[in-house]
């Protein structure tokens, strides 16, 4: 079975288009309405500033609506020039500028100009680093604005909206040409004020922070704008198709179209317990799929033409092939399609398959595989794993059921192993069916499953209970993580001082009766551990506002007494973010509006891929409580009666991970003669160790030597091809002595027959000395979507800081809604709000049930579910026939082990939180040392026993010094099992022995040191098995 490979949310491993690549088919657009002119960019800047500082969401809508109406009245009905600047992240025509904060800083230093030792030059280059004097640190556009304002002589900007769009078009067209882009940016510098440049830089960085969501902009622009965008992912088409606010789309216009990118359906976040997922299926048999972590991809085919694009609408046809004579995939899959197909759209995941090792390679190799034009049979290649059929022979299948679509999918495609395959799927009926499949996935180092209701329809850009992710249940969390909204914060002290260090989080209160009021949020939990230094830099750059106890935020409901949920500062929901949190349990508390809080909470990640609409609701909190109480009642009633047997199983040893035996590898060339290498494996890749061995063999075969250890004074070249920085590699990087090179340098050198130049593109991390080398700087620029290097892995700091105390005074509830302007009469007209004209907004769907149809195409759904016999003569909804039938999972009833009482985390019942200064307090660790393994009847590897024993002695001291407890394998409160990477042969057995009542985290010993270095509890995923 093919295994999934890790994939970042924004597809950083995916390649970017270059000038040499062929132009893609130009989309057809309706004739745009003609404007009578444009407007000064300054009036749009005034709108940005009003939106960014306005507290009330309804007032922001009215401001936006007033501005749109004035444009239509004075300039015309073509709002595309404005929408491109309001929603730069949605502008496909300017997908890439090739300019990030670092490049912009260097460019501005030259064009101002500033000396490299000038304090402002240093400030621009080090904009992320917080200082006591520099309150705007972490917000690059604001830092730039302050630097420019000291030197710019422009009092009034002269750029118009059309001129700015032309300038931005020129910057995008000249991506990678720094000299040309610098000249274009000089036009901006010479013709706009410092404040205007601040907003232009926000547009270039595609990070506006104007407190207005994309859905709000679309809803104000036109009632059908969001529906149309979901079907085409094309801002220009939305602007020109819907220029008339009074014209409504018909149902056909909201369907997907061949060769038009659409916003795919997504999975709902996992439920707290697997039983809840089963319940959400409404008693139906359901479909179980393994969750694949490749790159989400849609494939369109019409006749002999193909079109590929990502979840975000990025066109990858140039990579995979527009026709059978082009690309790295199309020539090999054309024969897989049934000859009766005229046109078809498939949804699936793009992976990288290695025919030699018969497994998937790390996601970072997708670019190399996709660009490979050699067509050699044994080279790694893209493989498309299909899980849905959405369009067939002119008919949209969005309103058909999953079962129907899958049944017909198997009659449309004949799988070609390693090229195009179906996602493996099983039928389930009980929670035990899911757990059985989860056990298989976990043993294969997978990360989860997707459960689908067989009658689910396909909802564009939708996320409901018809598709649910399932992840394993762990001892130190409630069975799953939750996504909560950060609403407020408290300042830290001591080593955590200098800004916000504790975050107050809330859930959306969906218990309130339906009304036109803005959503309210109920305080729920405080988080003080789990985030890294880079995360805190990003968090502190947010536009925090001072908390006024006499006038607290209207959207936030807090406890009547107590101070736990009262912050020093707060964030408006539109400026906030979702935090992924795990905790031991939910417990009663009168310190939060919910009446409950989380015990031992800690942050796992900032979910910048989620919107505030993905926030956990109050109803979901109470559902979690109900299911937990039910579980306890069942335990007390003795439903789980069978105790686990203590029979010890002997397990087979896994291959050694010290490196391959190179004695039998013949040396064929002297390409790497005299060069020494240390190869690191990718901990996120299931084939990491195997990939490492193959690379070491390649090095040896070409004259190089390999070592296992990086010595301080060694001149060894470090090789690493992952996307994260494992702890042991971080230690090497921190020394500042060694470069870290990507494996592509090895393969390219072998191809060239000599060592390839050390260009920037080959570096995962470069030392400061290397960065000044001519060879290193030969590259024209970085590619969009490239896997981030170690130097770039700190979170990109978001902009939009509002200094405490800088906001305008809160408005009285009875204040008239008309906005008072101190500007001239013309500007006043742009922002004049008319209460009688409030844009209609689509209603929010509250019901996620499969019985409630929330499809955009509900108005055209047939009363009966026809099959596609008219097109294809295939089977319909029957369960039995042929290729459309699902493999049936075993449904035998499994018994669960008895648990002596309700085991709770913590040293006492009263303990509620982690201690940020004693990070392992309340956690219990089992060390998989050779002595412990032998005592429990498990085999060990004698070769490493002494070294591993000594290492575990040091790990034990670190754990104890930081508040943790060392326990035995059968300790009920056990939370972590620590292994040494030199001998992980007992991983599967330890996983089985510690999986009840919930799984324990299996981590490498490096995880302990990484936590101590960061001063917080890190997410175990990076160092787990």
Swiss-Prot record:
Q: Which UniProt key words apply to this protein?
A: ATP-binding, DNA damage, DNA recombination, DNA repair, Ligase, Magnesium, Metal-binding, Nucleotide-binding, Nucleus, Repeat
Record field: compositional bias (Acidic residues): 775-785, 806-816, 845-870
Q: Which residues form the active site?
A: 291 (n6-amp-lysine intermediate)
- Binding residues for Mg(2+) 2: 447
**Which residues does the annotation say bind ATP?**
289, 291-292, 296, 349, 387, 447, 452, 469, 471
Subcellular location(s): the record lists: Nucleus
Bias (Basic and acidic residues): 817-838, 891-904
State where Mg(2+) 1 binds: 349
Q: Which cofactor does it need?
A: Mg(2+)
What does the UniProt function comment say about this protein?
DNA ligase involved in DNA non-homologous end joining (NHEJ); required for double-strand break (DSB) repair.
User: What is the protein named?
Assistant: DNA ligase 4
Task: Identify the taxonomic lineage of the organism of origin.
Answer: Eukaryota, Fungi, Dikarya, Basidiomycota, Agaricomycotina
Which gene is this protein's source?
A: LIG4
